[in-house]
């Protein structure tokens, strides 16, 4: 969180982050010094004390803060009793900040709360702005989307939630929109940033609205951009596209067969989200070392709500190579490996990596290929990573998409502290209703005829997506998919005049209603 806020404050001449915690001050200072080497214009000040003590909050002048971030002391994999106590402490901390402000308007507060009930309570506790993040809910919905899109979507999300990449901003020109502007028109009024949706005067967030939707004078556009300083609105179109038609072949949603390994606090939510996205005829198979009572009740509930999707709960020794082989991993479209929890982050990642190695060994043996690109029998492997230092090991295990869980949550919290409405955008983005992010084949947008490649300006890609009632945020270049230095082939919001040579294997990153 500190690292993200330092990045966000780079345009400030003198910024400060004040940390109040019960830890020893010297210990906190050492941890910060050991892990962060670049502070730019930001001063980091630590103070040891009880976070709910009003005198301590007055000493750090909490009432004058630009925003307040309240960290939850219990990790999502800890026992329920521990999480309940930690949530109560967060609620008490919110009340203490309100008290410091004497009931007047307080700074925006962003906090992490495990219980949905307590989350609702936190957000309605005062007249001020309180945004409560449920780590399990956010990550579960994100993981479910990774299973349904082409490889690389996690890289897009990583870029979106971090201040060192691209973010979304709420933008309205000082002198207004100039009248008679539709959302479709607005897309070509920005050169190297892209409108994703509208924040209207009623407070509604609408992602990928109808291209005919008029932009009212008080509306803000939700702009995906590298920085707010790079957002420039032009009164006239910056690009005149020539694309007037797109391929007309109808793409039907295809059924998926997805395996989920381990039952965690996220599994039930991931299952529910997958059911809400998947077409009929799809199959979801959960594999665990030891079945839990809630698994069958979850299956029963989902079967009633989604009778056209087959759901199974299977018990097997996930540490045994023979048992994993009987699972026939090569016959799944996607395999989600969830981190079951543990004493330390290193222990949790070690478990996931060892399981990945076993699955990879089976896939190589059964498909006769060394990587997924060499065989159609190689499913998409998706996993959680707790420590970003382990990413390279994970990638060498054959993983196509990964999520650094702790990092994602920290980055979102930092982003919401800078722009509270960002959480509303994420909530909308991760719902089955409306539009979500997908990476779709270039052939959905352009007719290649008999050509292996076509060369087009990025603005034509934007226009082709517009004709499909979509918004695109960038491209995926297949040739660079294995290159970490090239963001695994992901190119986000290039200039509309920049030309790209696209092949049938390349993709467009689209904000769309479904995967077709």
Please identify what each model-predicted range represents.
Residues 1-516:
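Cytosolic regulatory regions of ion transport systems
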């Amino acid at each position: 969180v500190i690292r993200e806020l330092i990045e966000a404050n780079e345009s400030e001449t003198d910024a400060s982050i004040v940390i109040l915690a019960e830890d020893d001050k010297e210990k906190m200072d050492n941890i910060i010094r050991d892990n962060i080497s670049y502070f730019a214009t930001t001063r980091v000040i630590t103070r040891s004390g009880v976070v709910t003590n009003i005198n301590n909050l007055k000493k750090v002048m909490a009432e004058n803060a630009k925003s307040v971030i309240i960290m939850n002391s219990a990790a999502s994999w800890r026992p329920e009793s521990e999480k309940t106590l930690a949530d109560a402490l967060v609620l008490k901390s919110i009340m203490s900040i309100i008290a410091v402000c004497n009931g007047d308007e307080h700074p925006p507060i962003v906090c992490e709360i495990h219980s949905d009930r307590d989350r609702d309570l936190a957000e309605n506790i005062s007249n001020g702005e309180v945004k409560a993040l449920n780590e399990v809910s956010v990550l579960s919905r994100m993981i479910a989307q990774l299973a349904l899109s082409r490889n690389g979507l996690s890289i897009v999300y990583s870029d979106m939630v971090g201040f060192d990449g691209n973010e979304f901003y709420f933008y309205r020109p000082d002198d207004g929109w100039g009248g008679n502007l539709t959302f479709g028109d607005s897309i070509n009024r920005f050169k190297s940033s892209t409108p994703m949706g509208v924040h209207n005067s009623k407070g509604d967030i609408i992602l990928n609205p109808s291209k005919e939707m008029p932009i009212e004078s008080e509306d803000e556009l939700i702009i995906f951009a590298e920085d707010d300083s790079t957002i420039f609105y032009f009164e006239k179109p910056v690009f005149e596209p020539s694309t007037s038609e797109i391929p007309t072949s109808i793409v039907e949603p295809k059924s998926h067969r997805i395996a989920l390994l381990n039952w965690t606090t996220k599994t039930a939510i991931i299952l529910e989200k997958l059911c809400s996205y998947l077409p009929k005829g799809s199959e979801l198979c959960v594999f665990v070392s030891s079945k839990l009572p809630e698994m069958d009740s979850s299956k029963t509930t989902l079967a009633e709500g989604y009778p056209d999707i087959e759901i199974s709960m299977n018990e097997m020794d996930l540490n045994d190579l023979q048992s994993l082989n009987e699972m026939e991993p090569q016959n799944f479209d996607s395999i989600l490996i969830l981190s079951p929890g543990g004493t330390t982050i290193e222990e949790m990642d070690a478990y996931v990596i060892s399981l990945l190695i076993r699955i990879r060994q089976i896939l190589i043996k059964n498909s006769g290929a060394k990587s997924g690109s060499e065989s159609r029998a190689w499913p998409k492997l998706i996993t959680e990573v707790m420590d970003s230092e382990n990413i390279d090991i994970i990638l060498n295990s054959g993983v196509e998409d990964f999520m650094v869980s702790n990092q994602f949550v920290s980055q979102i919290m930092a982003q919401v502290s800078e722009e509270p409405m960002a959480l509303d955008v994420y909530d909308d983005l991760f719902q089955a209703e409306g539009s979500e992010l997908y990476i779709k084949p270039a052939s959905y947008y352009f007719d290649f005829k008999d050509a292996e490649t076509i060369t087009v300006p990025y603005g034509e890609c934007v226009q082709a997506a517009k004709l499909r009632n979509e918004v695109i945020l960038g491209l995926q270049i297949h040739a660079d998919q294995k290159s970490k230095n090239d963001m695994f082939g992901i190119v986000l919001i290039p200039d509309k005049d920049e030309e790209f040579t696209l092949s049938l294997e390349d993709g467009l990153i689209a904000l769309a209603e479904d995967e077709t």
